[in-house]
Amino acid sequence: MSEEGGVEVKLLKPRKPLPDVGEIVVGTVQEVHDYGAYLILDEYGGVRAFLPWSEIASRAVRNIHAVLKPRQKVVVKVIRVYKKRGQVDVSLKRVMDSEKKRKMMFYKRYLKAATLVELIAEKLGKSVDEAYREVLWKLEDAYGDPMKGLEAAVLQGREALEKAGVPEEWIEPLLETAKTHVRVKTVKITFYLTLRSMAGDGVERVRKVLEAAKSQIESFKDSKVVARIYTVGAPKYRVELQGYNYKTLEKALEKMVEAARKTASKLGVEFSFERED
């Protein structure tokens, strides 16, 4: 945590001293003047950046104070880098809305991961530098985002951390913290099976078709895929697949439908499949 010009900011530790030209970064407004504003770059240890008045918006801004205020978080693009002075110039107007949204989401997730790992470091008697070097940067390299690494730890256990090269002494504390403080968003796919049999043991045949479909989920056990089957009203059955990514659910759906189709054909059960929009 740092306090610059009265603006308290939680600073992330940078892997390089200055950002590159064209890089999208997060900054905290420090001072606002008629000619522009000064920011602190949160991801670069408090590097100072200047946002010229002409780079605030595409249309003319009459009152800069109505657009920018001290302590405000902004997403900006680096347009000039002064290596000798350790400063940069940035632009607000050159960042698209989609870039702002994506960058702010990444930053917030990184900030949460850093906060959790730094708390663990304190308990282990480790420094902040060690927290970044031994955990955060390793998870970022392996998963593109340290929070994704912690989410993987929730789903896969210690293997996800070992894969990233995290030292053994960190693994159990990280697993414990991740399971308590990291929530992995679930996704769902719904589809319907229509199964008809006019045979005397038709109910039993339909049950076997449904069992054949559900048995396919066993191969997705490590991915934490859950399947639930509900009777909408014979002969229609609603199947809900829940997991942590759509790609895995799509594979599970394909296997379930194929198993149901083959079993239905073998048992003489009329079969049809329909996805929910």
From Swiss-Prot:
GO terms of molecular function: ribosome binding; RNA binding; translation initiation factor activity
This protein's UniProt keywords: Initiation factor, Protein biosynthesis, RNA-binding
Domain S1 motif, residue spans: 22-93
Matching InterPro entries: NA-bd_OB-fold, S1_domain, S1_IF2_alpha, TIF2_asu_arc, TIF2_asu_C, TIF2_asu_middle_sf, TIF_2_asu
CDD domains linked: S1_IF2_alpha (cd04452)
Subunit structure of this chain's protein: Heterotrimer composed of an alpha, a beta and a gamma chain.
PANTHER family hit by this protein: EUKARYOTIC TRANSLATION INITIATION FACTOR 2 SUBUNIT 1
HAMAP family, sorted: eIF_2_alpha (MF_00231)
Protein's job: eIF-2 functions in the early steps of protein synthesis by forming a ternary complex with GTP and initiator tRNA.
Family: Belongs to the eIF-2-alpha family.
Protein name as it appears in the record: Translation initiation factor 2 subunit alpha
Protein species of origin: Aeropyrum pernix (strain ATCC 700893 / DSM 11879 / JCM 9820 / NBRC 100138 / K1)
Underlying gene: eif2a
